[in-house]
Swiss-Prot record:
Cytoplasmic side: 1-27, 80-113, 174-194
InterPro entries, per database record: CASP/CASPL, CASP_dom
Subcellular location per the Swiss-Prot or TrEMBL entry: Cell membrane
Domain of life: Eukaryota
Organism of this sequence: Sorghum bicolor (Sorghum)
Topology within the bilayer: Multi-pass membrane protein
Stretches in topological domain Extracellular: 49-58, 135-152
GO cellular component: a single term: plasma membrane
Family affiliation: Belongs to the Casparian strip membrane proteins (CASP) family.
Full protein name: CASP-like protein 2C2
Amino acid sequence: MAAGQPRPPPPPSSVRTERVLRAACAAMAAAGALLLGFSAETKTVIFVQKKAVPKDVQALWVLIVAAAAAAAYHAAQLARCLCMDRLAGGGGGCRRLRRAVACATFLLDKGCAYMVLATTVAALQACFVGLLGVEALQWSKLCNIYTRFCEQAAAGMVCSLVAAAGMAVLSAFSARDLFRRRRPCSPCVQVQQV
């Protein structure tokens, strides 16, 4: 900055909160994807080596992809927030463009939150079979054999659930921003009754 130019005012607390929440959501979703993606354990059972990997449970694989996509989306949105504030200087700009960006952000935030929550719940449901077994189908409890894999998968799913909760809060921030930018209604014309 030049010596004579005033500093731009700091962003409002809601903008700072949104930035922190976006960074936290990106970090938690990335942590969940990494924990699940790198979880693997090999055990030898009766002279046969068997490796447990996330691809064995398709719901885990889908969760890894969804969490990684959500982390990338929130990192990109965080970069957009920082760039838009720097370029616009906190105000001005095209109102129509800002409304369109707010609408797209709202829809994408909602979709991202739903996607991560749905895939996490599906992975939890699939993993409960491995945790508890199904006696009617004679499926044994796999977490007794692959304990480290199950613990790492559980930690990844907890990270994904926390990220999904944060994304739900972020979609509320997006909704507030969208409706704050909407066009005001034209003044109501009062009709006089005769």
